[in-house]
């Protein structure tokens, strides 16, 4: 399989999307951070010394989405239409799941933006709580779904 971001000499290049049609692009990604009961309670009770952890993680996730083309070398800068975040608590597991959905009308997909948003949001939670629990585990960062473009629709089963 020939990779589109390599030229005929196997040198990296940014894919030329100028001939692609502008279509609605939507992608959703998610990831989970597991932690100790103490760390979970500090977040839930909003008593972290660094401030409101989940609210800060949401803002960080949005910033991560917007900065994707600056930190992932072959990503195109995109005019985003919407970034939506959701955090689900798993009380029994002392975990939070961050879900990020990104939307735009463009010539290339927003999968990397959604994945970057999840990654940055979860890393922000880690950063804000690491004084309490350095053993936190970030896991299962995945693309949940995407639609638009030539490859069509994908939904994780």
UniProtKB/Swiss-Prot annotation:
Pfam name, any one? MoaC
Q: Tell me which UniProt keywords the record has, alphabetically.
A: Lyase, Molybdenum cofactor biosynthesis
Reading the lineage from the top rank, the first entry is: Bacteria
**One Gene Ontology molecular-function label:** GTP 3',8'-cyclase activity
The catalytic activity, as recorded, is: (8S)-3',8-cyclo-7,8-dihydroguanosine 5'-triphosphate = cyclic pyranopterin phosphate + diphosphate
Under the heading InterPro entries, the entry gives: MoaC, MoaC_bact/euk, MoaC_sf, MoCo_biosynth_MoaA/MoaC, Mopterin_CF_biosynth-C_dom
Known function: Catalyzes the conversion of (8S)-3',8-cyclo-7,8-dihydroguanosine 5'-triphosphate to cyclic pyranopterin monophosphate (cPMP).
HAMAP family linked: MoaC_B
- The molecule here is called Cyclic pyranopterin monophosphate synthase
């Amino acid at each position: 399989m020939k990779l589109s971001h390599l030229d005929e000499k196997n040198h990296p290049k940014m894919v030329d999307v100028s001939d692609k049609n502008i279509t609605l692009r939507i992608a959703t990604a998610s990831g989970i951070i597991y932690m100790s009961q103490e760390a979970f309670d500090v977040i839930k009770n909003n008593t972290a010394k660094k401030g409101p952890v989940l609210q800060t993680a949401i803002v960080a996730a949005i910033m991560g989405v917007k900065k994707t083309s600056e930190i992932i070398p072959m990503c195109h800068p995109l005019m985003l239409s919407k970034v939506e975040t959701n955090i689900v608590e798993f009380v029994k597991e002392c975990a939070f799941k961050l879900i990020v959905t990104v939307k735009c009308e463009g010539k290339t997909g927003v999968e990397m933006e959604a994945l970057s948003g999840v990654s940055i949001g979860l890393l922000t939670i880690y950063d804000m709580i690491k004084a309490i629990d350095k053993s936190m585990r970030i896991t299962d960062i995945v693309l949940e779904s995407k639609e638009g473009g030539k490859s069509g629709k994908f939904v994780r089963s």
